[in-house]
Amino acid sequence: AEELFLKHGGHPHRDEENGIYCSTGSLGLGITVAVGRALANKNRKVHVLISDGESAEGSVWEALRFIKESNLPNIEVYVNVNGYAAYDKVDVKYLVDRLKVFLPTINIRYTSVNQYPFLRGLNAHYHVMSEQDYKSTL
């Protein structure tokens, strides 16, 4: 895990050699870029990973609706469902049910978020890890 973390970091960056053609920015941006790429080149399969937390963004729902209504066959959407957004928990059952209505072919992947003892409450989002904290996460 440490080797992969050191190689790729915590957020994907443009790395064409490994099939990552776009680095994303704001939440909801990745899926809209993926839809554009799928439209521009219908002979290639496009894969996009979104999260349950970012699914609160309107652009995500607009993109899902567009994929379904346009019958865009060359895009695969994967949702990392860990039950957390930036500052709060996500109602996973409600979200997954709603996602499947918008796009029945959506791929749901359930993951878990480790709860480390040094991360507590809303301030956890802004926690600066000590070296000891960092080593305990690997």
Explain the meaning of each model-derived region.
Residues 25-30, 79-81, 129-138:
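Short, surface-exposed, charge-dense and proline/glycine-enriched linear segments
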Residues 41, 72, 101-103:
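Short, well-ordered coil/turn elements that cap or connect secondary structure elements
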Residues 69-98:
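A short, conserved beta-to-alpha structural element at the edge of catalytic cores
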Residues 38, 49-50, 78-80, 111:
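Short beta-strand segments
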Residues 1-70:
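Cofactor-binding active-site loop characterized by glycine-rich and histidine/acidic residues
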Residues 46, 73-78, 105-106:
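Hydrophobic beta-strand segments of well-ordered beta-sheets in folded domains
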